[in-house]
């Protein structure tokens, strides 16, 4: 069933532009309360957290108005990462955790991610229930009763408890870390404060960039989707690695001192290979359709089962839970480690990478996965472009360029108004040539149909 509001990762779009108007968020709050908080023994305790966008606190207040129609007890963690909300929701027995964020998007966009009492993102069925209630409230011309509500401030508690959790529950070698310099790109986002604190306490020598959010500079020419400046910063700091997070802190990309970009596939490879050397069990790994084929080959060679899902960390998580696996992730840098966390976590993933890369280095093994050449191309389109035009274009392009010598994924993004093309082959020339041909074909097709 196609959803009207929820995408690959929650609800996301430009704030105050339909459908994400102020009234929508009030309706959303009421719909959440009426659809997800009616079960027996529910105490209606809600936890909010947000990233640094200028609209985030306003959205928290709007959703709270709707939630308060069902007399909820609402706590506000302030600016904090998505994984920290997942952790704190479960630890402190909230019924729901709600993150106001648009992840790696620029500041004009915003949205929400919702976690259940166990710290997992709500199910597709839950999303359908919320959407159905929103439509019902719209049809009933629902008017929110003005009422006073209190937001209980838990911002200091969550930062303290999350920091302790990261440092106590992850593999660390503090004595070895003392000589390791790191450059942190904090994306002017949710980890701008706690990220620096955790890496310092873990024993690293840290230099931070993009740690001065102003409400409008989140992910702006920085963070895990913009690595252009990081190599120069690493060189200036004489760092071993640059750790680049996204705006809400649930994904990470790493750059080493030789300018090698280590994405989610490299991070998974390093963790798995380090675990094997360390005589730790790896039951299986979950990736997505975008995961580089080289990782699949390596895992099979080691006798480790590998499963692919659709793009989206929720799909990865579902498959991990179904198969009892602890490790999974996306090329984009969402790394899931269920023995530590219920959500992708940039800080935990980076700490794990650093621990296992040290083990590999001591055994004179490279942390870099020798990948098949791969290229991802994004074609952006206007928000009002009809869904059927997009679907027809993707279908026809996928059929036209089907080729036994390459792996091709063409899909509509679940988080942005764009079509993503992934071309992978053994030969780099084929990848470049086919990427250009497919891009030109899709652009011409969209122009002709719209």
Segments predicted by a language model, with ranges:
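Gly/Ser/Thr-enriched, mixed-charge loops and adjacent short helices
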Residues: 1, 14, 110-234
């Amino acid at each position: 069933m196609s959803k009207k509001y929820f995408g690959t990762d929650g609800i996301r779009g430009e704030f105050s532009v339909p459908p994400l108007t102020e009234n929508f968020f009030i309706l959303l709050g009421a719909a959440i309360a009426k659809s997800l908080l009616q079960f027996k023994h529910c105490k209606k305790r809600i936890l909010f957290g947000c990233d640094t966008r200028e609209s985030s606190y306003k959205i928290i207040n709007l959703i709270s108005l709707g939630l308060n129609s069902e007399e909820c007890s609402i706590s506000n963690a302030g600016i904090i990462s998505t994984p920290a909300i997942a952790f704190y929701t479960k630890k402190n027995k909230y019924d729901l955790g709600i993150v106001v964020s648009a992840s790696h998007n620029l500041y004009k966009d915003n949205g929400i991610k919702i976690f259940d009492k166990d710290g997992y993102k709500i199910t597709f069925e839950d999303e359908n229930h919320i959407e159905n209630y929103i439509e019902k409230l719209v049809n009933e011309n629902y008017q929110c009763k003005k009422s006073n509500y209190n937001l209980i401030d838990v911002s200091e508690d969550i930062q303290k408890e999350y920091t302790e959790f990261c440092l106590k529950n992850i593999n660390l070698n503090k004595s070895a870390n003392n000589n390791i310099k790191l450059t942190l790109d904090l994306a002017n986002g949710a980890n701008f404060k706690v990220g620096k604190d955790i890496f310092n306490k873990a024993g690293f020598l840290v230099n931070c960039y993009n740690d001065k959010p102003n409400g409008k500079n989140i992910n702006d020419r920085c963070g895990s989707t913009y690595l252009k400046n990081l190599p120069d910063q690493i060189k200036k700091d004489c760092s071993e690695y640059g750790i680049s997070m996204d705006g809400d802190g649930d994904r990470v990309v790493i750059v080493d001192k030789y300018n090698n970009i280590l994405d989610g596939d490299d991070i998974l490879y390093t963790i798995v290979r380090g675990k094997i050397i360390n005589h730790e069990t790896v039951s299986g790994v979950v990736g997505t359709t975008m995961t580089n084929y080289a990782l699949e080959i390596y895992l099979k060679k080691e006798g480790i089962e590998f499963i692919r899902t659709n793009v989206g960390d929720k799909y990865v998580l579902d498959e991990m839970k179904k198969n009892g696996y602890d490790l999974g992730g996306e090329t984009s840098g969402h790394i899931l480690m269920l023995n530590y966390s219920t959500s992708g976590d940039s800080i935990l993933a980076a700490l794990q990478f650093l621990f296992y890369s040290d083990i590999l280095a001591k055994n004179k093994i490279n942390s870099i996965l020798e990948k098949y050449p791969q290229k991802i191309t994004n074609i952006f389109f206007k928000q009002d472009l009809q869904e059927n035009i997009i679907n027809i274009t993707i279908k026809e392009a996928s059929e036209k360029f089907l080729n036994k010598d390459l792996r091709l994924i063409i899909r509509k993004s679940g988080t942005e108004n764009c079509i993503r093309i992934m071309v992978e082959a053994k030969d780099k020339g084929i990848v470049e040539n086919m990427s250009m041909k497919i891009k030109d074909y899709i652009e011409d097709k969209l122009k002709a149909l719209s």
